[in-house]
Amino acid sequence: MYYRNDLKFYIMLKLQAETTLPTDFGNFKLLAFSEKEEDWMPHLALIAEGTELDTVTNIRIHSECITGEIFHSRKCECGQQLDAAMKYISENGGIILYLRQEGRNIGIINKIKAYQLQEKGFDTVEANLKLGLPADDRDFNPAIEILDILGVDKINLLTNNPEKM
């Protein structure tokens, strides 16, 4: 459901769970946000230890990438980008918003099909379009809503794609 008087579209996420997560990069607070507690794919926020949320906050919005983050695929740099963001935010404070929208939000099965087309010479956008899918179907409204829930209103957005801003 989407609502909001100020024209922002919200999904009505709620904080469902949180814990401290020790990582190779330092300690983070891990928070899970979803509409319902039983949602098995919540959006996640990793907040570096010592982060002040009432000042300008470093933010990295990262979309899930199973092939790059878990299997270290050479077809993308997502795993390396996430590692670099975790290192930077651990050292400088901030939040990583991990949005559950695999393969530009086309899902893992369609992403595998797109990979197969890439083996035939198509790039990512061409492969998605050939499959009848959008070039990029990601929705960043959950990131806005999570930042709103956390009370963050001044950000320094960390990106490797400034042309997408």
Predicted region positions:
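Catalytic domains of riboflavin
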Residues: Y2-M165
